[in-house]
Amino acid sequence: MSAEVFISYASEDRSRILDLVERLRKADVSVWIDQMGIEGATMWTQEIVEAIDNCKVLILAISPSSTESENVVKELALASERRKKILPVCLESSGIPKSMEYQLAGIQRVDYFLNQEDQAVQAMIRSLGKLGVAVNDEASDQAAKAPGFISHGSSHLKDAGAKKTK
């Protein structure tokens, strides 16, 4: 099944991503994630490549787990190579690692960690609509009225090389 939006995420973030998928689908956004789009006995790498090829936008769910995920880094690289539009969605307040910095330079992100997920989802819907993804009219109208949760790309890159302190 072809979808307009591919979500790249780490398996450790699955519960938050499934909540996000449900919210996006309520706005009639066509979403593909690995757990729902891969049939049994198929080559999962081939399915992922086809899903990225067929999507309009890759949502990159950024978290400490995803920045360490080899598969997430590969999906981002493939989407970038295929010139797909990328919408970074930060699940936590963390810097962008060097492995993703090049592909995300200058791209605005949505912050999904502010305990105001409804408004963040509205910002995503607004962004997806601007990137050519079909959303239902009611969701589009609500998104247009919602406050923004978009951060400018260059501001989040300055912490890319920063080390975490405990």
Segments from the language model and where they lie:
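Conserved beta-strand/loop subsegment of P-loop NTPase cores
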Residues: 86-90
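Short amphipathic alpha-helical segments
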Residues: 18-21, 71-74, 100-102
